[in-house]
Amino acid sequence: RSFPLETRLSNPQIKKLIEGGLSAPQTVTPITDPLSEAELECLLSIPLARSRPSVAVYLSGPWLQPSQNQALMLVDTGAENTVLPQNWLVRDYPRIPAAVLGAGGVSRNRYNWLQGPLTLALKPEGPFITIPKILVDTFDKWQILGRDVLSRLQASISIPEEVRPPMVGVLDAPPSHIGLEHLPVPPEVPQFPLN
């Protein structure tokens, strides 16, 4: 007997124990045709440093300063939107005040929405994407490449693994020491029923 999916998700008796936890059956969509080598070369891979993951970005748009056609931006997968500093833009750009909820709470009067197209690319030859609106930092502190651009570029992020030598600890204490030697010796009194 089969149940509809809504019943299976709400009835705990029908859920199955999968890999140590209760979970509903998962639907997996099979890949019918694998990507060709030409399509794999078109996918964008961003190599990043572990300490400060930043990437060069090529910008164009009607509201940018003429000197700001290339910039180094911080890649932040936790940021929903891309953020540009205000000094990269002309003074009379179309702005809408925005309240941004971050780790430190809601920040008001600091960010504006730039309503206007902005074209971005990670290579001079493309692929180019156009973003309809972008956050502007009025304190000129942040230039962040957010998830909106990364998802439109269909970029994958590769962070190199740090190779560490294996740590080998040398035990120089005699086997009778267990690390409690600094405590006082317990009293020798009969403790019923422990002895």
Curated annotation (Swiss-Prot):
Residues 71-149 form the Peptidase A2 domain. One of its GO terms (biological process) is proteolysis. Keywords: Aspartyl protease, Hydrolase, Protease. Its EC number is 3.4.23.-. Pfam families: RVP. Coiled coil: none annotated. The active site is at residue 76. One of its GO terms (molecular function) is aspartic-type endopeptidase activity. It is an enzyme of class 3 (hydrolase). It comes from the Viruses. This is Protease. It comes from Bovine leukemia virus (isolate Japanese BLV-1) (BLV). The lineage of its organism: Viruses, Riboviria, Pararnavirae, Artverviricota, Revtraviricetes.
